[in-house]
UniProtKB/Swiss-Prot annotation:
Record's keyword terms, sorted: Acyltransferase, Amino-acid biosynthesis, Cytoplasm, Methionine biosynthesis, Transferase
Function recorded in the entry: Transfers a succinyl group from succinyl-CoA to L-homoserine, forming succinyl-L-homoserine.
Pathway: Amino-acid biosynthesis; L-methionine biosynthesis via de novo pathway; O-succinyl-L-homoserine from L-homoserine: step 1/1
UniProt record similarity statement: Belongs to the AB hydrolase superfamily. MetX family.
Transmembrane segments: none
Pfam family, one: Abhydrolase_1
Organism: Pseudomonas fluorescens (strain Pf0-1)
SUPFAM superfamilies: alpha/beta-Hydrolases
GO cellular component, one term: cytoplasm
Recorded catalytic activity of this chain's protein: L-homoserine + succinyl-CoA = O-succinyl-L-homoserine + CoA
Residues that bind substrate: R227, D357
The protein, known as: Homoserine O-succinyltransferase
Amino acid sequence: MPAAFPPDSVGLVTPQTAHFSEPLALACGRSLADYDLIYETYGTLNAQASNAVLICHALSGHHHAAGYHSVDDRKPGWWDSCIGPGKPIDTNKFFVVSLNNLGGCNGSTGPSSLNPETGKPFGADFPVLTVEDWVHSQARLADLLGIGQWAAVIGGSLGGMQALQWTITYPDRVRHCLAIASAPKLSAQNIAFNEVARQAILTDPEFHGGSFQEHGVIPKRGLMLARMVGHITYLSDDSMGEKFGRGLKSEKLNYDFHSVEFQVESYLRYQGEEFSGRFDANTYLLMTKALDYFDPAANFNDNLAKTFEGAKAKFCVMSFTTDWRFSPARSRELVDALMAARKDVSYLEIDAPQGHDAFLIPIPRYLQAFGNYMNRITL
């Protein structure tokens, strides 16, 4: 990290923790008696509290979306390319809130937190969560911060699903919804990928039925495999071909099953190794189930247009040409439903070779379109 922060950075940020003691009823039929949500804010809330923007994170995301926690940080927050002075989500204009969702493993109450009833980590006993549960908890955070209505709720992938759910559950509290590289529900193939990832974790002997913390271990192999499978789906065939091709790590083949021979193998193992050291296995299970369960149209006889009839927000939907995890066809399905419901909707399909992860990458056309939409939001 250079001695001075870039001029378009939000600079040093300090996470804050909000404690909630009012029980939160969950879709699974259980409730949490009390819980914490860790969050960060960027920019300044105006006197009318009309410039607040909520950032909803994807599966492995967290509250640290922009800026730096220390001058020694090697990298800024995960969406730093989009949040800051003069960036698409301009902190000179907006007050930005980014949190780690309930069930997460970065400071909000989740499976790795201590269960006050037992004095041990919740582990697998932590209740299964849904996107709507998250939205309810986010609404409580908004209340705490004095935000009656969001100028915009924004998210990519699973974050986009949360943004969509906000317009359904709290239609009066969202003026703009930006759903990026997202979908109105998972396809069978997507559910299948999630199940393979879960089985990698569940069948790891070190998982111990979710109580691995009590045994002083982590299901590292299962987490690595889950991340490796997931990461393949976040990239496109073209981007993998361009980045790795059939390149070898050494000059010759070893003719065995143990060596890391291809560059792509090395990359996947690195991603799995890094992920297994920072992410909680039970949280991974929770996040993938929340993805699987998201299907708001199920409450409206599978009529997606009817699902959004009560929404009052304006919508911006963006997709990427090579995203096969949440393909442009899924975004167009959403756009068609919104138009059928007579909603104000903008749609852009961005030509990008990076696959699903493109929403995290500073692609010029993407940033320009993103910024142009945000500039049109009146406060």
